């Protein structure tokens, strides 16, 4: 029996390698900012999710250091024991007020927040209907939950409506993302929200890549489309420059999650110093509009300079995919850019569908016009 596990592991690794899909962790020596250092060499970083440039901000670092001085290193317990402190409560209140909800519940990651909602909310006889390109955390939770799961074609409102009308399950939960992380495109939230309400279903939006970047003062995609879903998930590992997540909902749903969401109940709470730093990151997002303005300008520059380049997808976000096709060519292009001092990651199946391997270029407010020019010139030469 023990040998069966070893054989399974060996076989899986061999097949992954033969398919050219093996991934490796890279040791970053000096931070994950607009420049990074690997094996003693400096690269322009176009692979991170630090959209507003807060991850390396000295102002935010000082806020975390202040939190450490005030509250120590760790929370010491789960939230329902003694791990929930004033910085956690303050952050939840600030998020709820900012995003227009009654309640917020903190989690240690966006992955755990998404799974916690689906696992705690869905029961046998329920239905969850998800966009076909939703994040792995949502898809996995939907498959493993006791509910019936269906997928609607990407951003296809009519298909969602058809699935909901044909369903005999009740209740139904519709789940989508605000910004899709691999294509950088937006979900048609207004239409999806309308169809969901017409079919008496609940609507959940994961706005990991929109919150902080889009909408009034960075409130995200729901603000951009002027909708209020039943459940909103925001994460802190992108525009906030830190880590963690929160689920926004009404008070009763928040109480329910606090009681039944096992990822929340049985996990050590995030350090209070981190919550303190996140509150400061939130104030920076709200007040430092120049970061979003600069990001927009860099985005326009990137697309203008690559307007004739095959495979470049135009987006309203700092995520700029360049569709290559096969994995080998995508890896070769990524390696060639690294030789020129630019770090771009080749995204391959199973993360994206077969035949759509790509470079996932991401921009940050910490980049300069010169940085973008260097990248676009290099891509033009190599393509």
From Swiss-Prot:
Question: What's its EC?
Answer: 2.3.1.47
One Pfam family assigned to this protein is: Aminotran_1_2
What this protein catalyses is: 6-carboxyhexanoyl-[ACP] + L-alanine + H(+) = (8S)-8-amino-7-oxononanoate + holo-[ACP] + CO2
- Top-level taxon in the UniProt lineage: Bacteria
Per the record, residues carrying N6-(pyridoxal phosphate)lysine are: 238
Asked if the keyword Transferase belongs to this entry, the reply reads yes
Where does this protein hold pyridoxal 5'-phosphate? 110-111, 181, 209, 235
Annotated residues that bind substrate are located at: 23, 135, 351
Q: Which cofactor does it need?
A: pyridoxal 5'-phosphate
Entry GO MF terms = 8-amino-7-oxononanoate synthase activity; pyridoxal phosphate binding
UniProt pathway annotation: Cofactor biosynthesis; biotin biosynthesis
BP GO terms, sorted: biotin biosynthetic process
Recite the UniProt keywords alphabetically. Answer: Biotin biosynthesis, Pyridoxal phosphate, Transferase
Keyword flag Chaperone: no
- Could you tell me which InterPro entries the record lists for this protein? Aminotrans_II_pyridoxalP_BS, Aminotransferase_I/II_large, AON_synthase_class-II, AONS_Archaea/Proteobacteria, AONS_Proteobacteria, PyrdxlP-dep_Trfase, PyrdxlP-dep_Trfase_major, PyrdxlP-dep_Trfase_small
Q: Which HAMAP family match?
A: BioF_aminotrans_2 (MF_01693)
Q: Which family does it belong to?
A: Belongs to the class-II pyridoxal-phosphate-dependent aminotransferase family. BioF subfamily.
Could you tell me what this protein does? Answer: Catalyzes the decarboxylative condensation of pimeloyl-[acyl-carrier protein] and L-alanine to produce 8-amino-7-oxononanoate (AON), [acyl-carrier protein], and carbon dioxide.
Quaternary arrangement and interactors, per the entry?
Homodimer.
What is the protein name for this chain?
8-amino-7-oxononanoate synthase
Organism encoding this protein: Aliivibrio salmonicida (strain LFI1238) (Vibrio salmonicida (strain LFI1238))
> What gene does this protein come from?
bioF
């Amino acid at each position: 029996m023990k040998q069966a596990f070893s054989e399974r592991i060996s076989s899986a690794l061999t097949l992954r390698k033969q398919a050219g899909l093996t991934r490796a962790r890279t040791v970053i020596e000096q931070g994950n900012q607009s420049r990074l250092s690997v094996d003693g060499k400096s690269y322009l970083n176009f692979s991170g999710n630090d959209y507003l440039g807060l991850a390396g901000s000295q102002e935010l670092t000082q806020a975390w250091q202040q939190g450490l001085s005030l509250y120590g290193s760790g929370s010491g317990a789960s939230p329902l024991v003694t791990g929930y402190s004033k910085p956690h409560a303050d952050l939840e209140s600030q998020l709820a007020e900012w995003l227009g909800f009654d309640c917020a519940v903190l989690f240690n990651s966006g992955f755990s927040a998404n799974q916690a909602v689906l696992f705690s909310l869905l029961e046998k006889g329920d239905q969850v209907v998800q966009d076909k390109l939703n994040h792995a955390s949502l898809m996995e939770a939907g498959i493993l939950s006791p509910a019936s799961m269906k997928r609607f074609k990407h951003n296809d409102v009519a298909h969602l409506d058809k699935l909901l009308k044909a369903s005999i399950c009740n209740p139904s939960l519709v789940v989508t993302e605000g910004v899709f992380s691999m294509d950088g495109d937006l979900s048609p939230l207004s239409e999806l929200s309308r169809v969901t309400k017409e079919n008496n279903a609940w609507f959940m939006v994961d706005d990991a890549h929109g919150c902080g970047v889009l909408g009034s003062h960075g409130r995200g995609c729901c603000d951009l489309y002027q909708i209020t879903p039943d459940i909103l998930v925001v994460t802190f590992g992108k525009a906030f420059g830190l880590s963690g997540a929160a689920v926004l909902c009404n008070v009763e749903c928040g109480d329910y999650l606090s009681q039944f969401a096992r990822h929340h109940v049985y996990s050590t709470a995030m350090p209070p110093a981190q919550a303190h730093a996140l509150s400061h990151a939130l104030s920076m997002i709200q007040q430092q509009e120049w970061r979003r303005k600069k990001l927009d300008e860099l985005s326009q520059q990137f697309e203008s300079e690559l307007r004739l380049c095959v495979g470049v997808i135009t987006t309203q976000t700092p995520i700029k995919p360049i569709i290559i096709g096969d994995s080998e060519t995508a890896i070769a292009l990524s390696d060639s850019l690294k030789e020129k001092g630019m770090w771009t990651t080749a995204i391959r199946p199973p993360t994206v569908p077969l035949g759509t391997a790509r470079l996932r270029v991401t921009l940050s407010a910490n980049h300069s016009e010169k940085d973008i020019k260097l990248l676009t010139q290099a891509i033009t030469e190599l393509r």
